[in-house]
Structure formats: C-alpha cells, structure tokens
From Swiss-Prot:
One of its GO terms (biological process) is cell wall organization. Pfam families: BacA (PF02673). It is a multi-pass membrane protein. Keywords: Antibiotic resistance, Cell inner membrane, Cell membrane, Cell shape, Cell wall biogenesis/degradation, Hydrolase, Membrane, Peptidoglycan synthesis, Transmembrane, Transmembrane helix. Its main location: membrane. It comes from the Bacteria. This is Undecaprenyl-diphosphatase. InterPro entries: UppP. Catalyzes the dephosphorylation of undecaprenyl diphosphate (UPP). Confers resistance to bacitracin. It is an enzyme of class 3 (hydrolase). One of its GO terms (cellular component) is plasma membrane. One of its GO terms (molecular function) is undecaprenyl-diphosphatase activity. It catalyses: di-trans,octa-cis-undecaprenyl diphosphate + H2O = di-trans,octa-cis-undecaprenyl phosphate + phosphate + H(+).
Amino acid sequence: MELYQGVVLGVLQGLTEFLPVSSSGHLVLGQNFFGITEPALSFDISVHLGTLFAVALVFFKEIKAMVVSLGRLVQNLGSLKNFKQVVKADGDVRLAALIIVGSIPTAVIGLILKNYVHALFSSLVIVGSMLMVTGTFLWLTRHSTPGGKKVEQIGFGTALFIGVCQGVAVIPGISRSGATIAAGLFSGVERETAARYSFLLSMPAIAGAEILSLKESFATGAGFDTVTLLSTLTAFIVGTLALVALLKIVKKGRFYLFAPYCWVVGLISIIAGFVA
C-alpha cells in the first residue's frame, strides 16, 4: 500500500467511523478504488485504534467520572443497602451499567456473524444495498418524536435494543453510529444523550474487536510500518473533528441530512457492483 493510499483510507476511517455513513462500507469502496483486495490486518487494527483514541479524547471527562464512580461503588459495596437504587440514582454508575448491558448483545451478534461478514466485504452490491438501508432509517429519524430521556431514565431494555443494533452494524454498509443513535431517538432518548451513549458504547465493541484482531495479527506475524502508523494518526485527528461535528449536528436535530448521501453512494455502489 502506498503512503497516500494509507492516508486517504485513514481520512475515510476517521470521517465515516462517526458520521452515520458506514466506515466499513466506505473502506470497502476505498479499497476497491485503489485496487487493494485485502488490506493488511495490522492496518485495519491500527486505523480502528485511531478512532478509539478519538472517542477516549472527546469523552475523557465522562470516562473518568464513570471510573471514579465505579471505584467508589466497589469500595463501599459492603455497606450499600440498596445496590439497585445506587445504580439508578448515580448518573455515572448508571451510564456504565447501560454500556455493559448494551455491549452484551453486540458481542454475541458480532461473534456469530464474524465469519460470515468477512465475505461480504468484497461485494459492492451488498455494501450499496446496506447503505440504502442506512439512509432510510436516518431519514425516518426526521419523523421521530423528540424524546427527553436522560441517562437516568434509560431502561436496560432500551440498552439491549441499541446493543442489538450495534451488533447488526457489523454488516458492511450499515452505519454503527447511525443505527445506534437512530435506535436511541426512536426509543425516546434525548438527542445529545443518544449520541453520547452511542459513542461510549462503541468503545467496548471496538476494543473487543481489536483484541481478537491483534491475536490473529500476532499469529500471522503481521507488522506495523510507516504507512500504517501515519494512517492511524490521520484517523485519530480526522475522527476527533468528525465526532465533535456530529455531536453538534445531532443536538440540532439534523441527523437525517446524511440520508441522501447514503442513498446516492449506495446506488452508485450497486451499479458499480453489477457493472464489475
């Protein structure tokens, strides 16, 4: 892979990991454009680490607050009379619990689909079709009733539902952020809270996938070169900017504006797939 190709793919990963247009779908399109049939596993791991660090940077305060609250909870566990009440009343503990609950269906679905999804990355028709699906549920958020649920009002059933949507987003062309934020909005969650939860929920999913991929990478002896490292840095910088921008867009209720883009790119992908 040439240096400029790695940088372009890093930009694509950084932008599309958080914007609701499917990072996996766009990486497939980018790889097809450059004629890269099978990118190095170490490259895939690295660019995803770049976007994981972007989430950690943007939500550092929230992550720190959750860690502190959970630490305090563990220290006082023996003296707590009503554990459930504490989880419900403490917003930081509640958020951590919701992330854990939401991560369960994501992990189960991801492990089940892992071997089947790999083959889909070579199909422009499937990627394009799933982008059309992504565009449709993004557009439907325009008609969702604005909810007011904050973290303390989100039920574990809602967390499971959002986690299922995140798991399904392993299919290339289905946007993870689009699916999870839309699921939150349809469930009556307040816009900014839905976005915050979506991106914090992505951290265990990305980290878990990275651990599995690293194990495979070490087994194959894959290494990390200059192109890979520069792509990672690019994904981190662009991802941070994209994440901050999307939070503002969701807060203003303009999430649906990404739908036409998904439809256009999806249609082009389907046509290109049939022509090829």
